[in-house]
Amino acid sequence: MKKPILISRAIVVLPYETTTIEVGRPKSIQAIDLAKQSSSKEIIIISQKDIDTDEVVNFDELYKVGTLVKIKSIIDNFDEGYSIEVEGLKAVYINNENDVIDAIEYEYEDVITNPILSNKDEIAINGINSEIFNIINKRSRHKNINFDNMHALISLEKEKFAYLAAATYINDYDNEISEKTIEDRINILLQPNLLLVHETILHLLFDQLVDKRVIEDEVEKTITDKINNNFQKQQREFYLREKLKVVKEQLGELSSREEDADKIRAKIEDLELPPNVKERALAELNRFENAMSSNESSVIKSYLDWLLDLPWTQQGVDNTDLMSVRTHLDDNHYGIEKVKERILEYLALRMRNPNLKGPIICLVGPPGVGKTSLVTSIAQALNKKFVKVSLGGVRDESEIRGHRKTYVGAMPGRIIKGMKKAGVINPLFLLDEIDKMTSDQRGDPAAAMLEVLDPEQNKNFSDNYIEEEYDLSKVMFMATANYYQQIPYALIDRLEVIELSSYTAIEKREIAKSHLLKRIFMDAKLNENELIFTDDALDFIINHYTKEAGVRELDRQLGHIVRKYIVETYKNKNNQSPLNLKVDEAMIIKYLGKIKFDFNKKEETTIPGIVNGMAYTAAGGDLLPIEVNHSTNGKGGNVTITGNLEKTMNESVSVALGFVKANADKYGIDTKKVSFKEIDIHVHVPSGGIPKDGPSAGIAITTAIISSLSQRPVRTTLSMTGEIMLRGNVGIIGGVKEKVISAYRAGVREIILPIDDERYLEDVPKYILDDIKIHLVKHYDEVYNIVFGEK
């Protein structure tokens, strides 16, 4: 059932409480008008957190709980709104599907879903009500305070008595509503059953009794007789403990809080804590001992457990033996020399300066190239505790900084949780998938990460739950990401980015031989001489059954072959596997099925209008044939582009065509026979099911257009890549290593690259560079001379 909601400022109505509310805001007036039309005259009153806000738009600006009330009378103040008298019925939650307040009416559900009391609970509530009555009776006799309603409350039934006692007496001296009063009333409404409601009201009345210094003179005197006058704090604690013990005895559940407090105090004394943390821990322990409800004590104990379980001074011992670290990394990971060298640099500096702040390294590369496993191996090599936090899909800032203790079920953020798990202040902390964080109305987690990853700030990292500054300066942070462009710029500025490119076929083969097969054989309890994978067999699997940048699919395919082999062995009647069985193409096809992938190969025959371009893909690189044809059968002047090309590549076609038109005579096109107004040009890039984008095909498209219009073929052993400018300059491109390797694999032995990409050739394996001719060009004139000869 839906009810209108009325958003109030600093007004929280308790059940059975009658109060008058002035209504003036437009949405509030709409809610009253809607409630007037209903037979029940019921409306939900819920208070906003910030009383200075004029218009509330989101539910997170409201308190979590409200009150269903019945409107008893309405006075129309005309232009100034309404004055309404309401009576509280029950505490309710609003069911909202959206975070934005976009309606007047909403569904609701009761906070107390089962109002029926057991006999045990009724006995306990009677005892609590007796204590409430004693407190009210003593307070009403205090010389500075006069309560006229106290005697009227005595005759009420027990549920009304407790609620109205709270409504009457939980306030300030001058009866004005304060922030604390609002929070106290909200706390009462949040209780899920009547027993907890009564316990909470008793607890709050105790606080009022102490905070307003209205303890009865006789009680003061009794306590003073028992305890020395110099220990007023102990007097107060003793009084509250004794009162609470009476209630607990009636509930039949005396807790072991004293035992827990002794253990916590001993732990505080044993640990080496910073002075501010120790002081905070002792203060919270005092609150724990004096807590009036089991709910409050459990919250405080949970906080103390987190505070004391965090490593504040405990430090692990790092392995500073450079040679052993290098050996460990080489044994576990093939290649990736840049990362290994950076780790050794850090260790060398750490040996000179033990107080050196840890580096913040971000490994960027395609999925499956070993980023996470490499960080794990680094932690093992350095003898560091390892903590991993996955940031993929994190969209709430509180996931990083934690929730404030005022929230129900509050917990620290992932950083503090990770440090607790590590148990030392100098672990290796992996922030996995840092490029996958997103932001929404709950905050930007990337902004919270700025403090974590800034060496100048993370010495004083602040978690909303812990509330004490925590030193992260000794942590060695490492991060991983798939896409550099998706990392927020402010974070990139704090990271040392090392890019991991996709593995070449040869690197995949070596990884399979050195790591994957060894692990697979070990898991299968298989001897290495039972099944032999030759280099040719591994190359066949890599080229025809995987298409990836890393080696995850290769690992799965190798495991599939081994499992099939073992099953076949058990089917053998003799149950004996042959020794030295070599895996060949026939066996691979038998176990893995027909070939799944094939890389593009160069054309064997030369045809005008076809040029080998070069593509950089998520799985490495590939040859990218560019096809151009022209005809005079159409209207003329039309350009057709096919092959699933994205915006940038379409623009490359336009730039290439514009450049060719402006320089047709220069590049051997007979403009007397070929009129651009009379011909239609068709540019096509095969594999139309795959989207293609980027400017790097510019010179290949230009060459294909010239080849088609001049009817001069381009040799198939040549491929090219580079951006074309309107003035003919050749621009820099990316993915040089992957493109060169894929072209070489396809049979190309001559490659044209922009001169600005020369620096990236050092990443290409030497055996390829020794067997291929690289042309470095600055202007398209040089490309034309290489392809068609001197003009």
Swiss-Prot record:
Q: Name one GO molecular function term.
A: sequence-specific DNA binding
Which EC class heads this enzyme's classification?
hydrolase
Expression is induced as follows: By heat shock.
Q: Where in the cell is it found?
A: Cytoplasm
Segments forming domain Lon proteolytic = 605-790
Question: What keywords were assigned to this record?
Answer: ATP-binding, Cytoplasm, Hydrolase, Nucleotide-binding, Protease, Serine protease, Stress response
Spell out the catalytic residues.
696, 739
In short, the EC number is 3.4.21.53
Q: Which HAMAP family match?
A: lon_bact (MF_01973)
Q: Which family does it belong to?
A: Belongs to the peptidase S16 family.
Protein name (record): Lon protease
Gene name for this UniProt entry? lon
